[in-house]
Amino acid sequence: MDRPDEKIKQHIPQDELLAQLAEECAELSQAALKLRRALTGINPTPVTVEEARKNLVEETADVYNVLGLLLDAVENAEIYDIIRRKKARWVKRLEG
């Protein structure tokens, strides 16, 4: 673990990191919905597609940042295995 991670974990307990993760996930959800509005134009927003996409990236980084503090390397490897399986299942559904 690198120094910034250690310092953060010394000051913020796991339950608070989980609360922060929930907050960041909510913000990511809002960013995704805002980008959808910007892309479709059905429910207009003053935010441009470019601004909305940048915000989505920013909020994604916030989620990754907190997850990096909560999960270890083994769990991260497991996540990528799960992602591969789920994508394969998704493709099968699309192909009927």
What role is predicted for each listed range?
Residues M1-G96:
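Flexible "arm" and connector segments at domain edges
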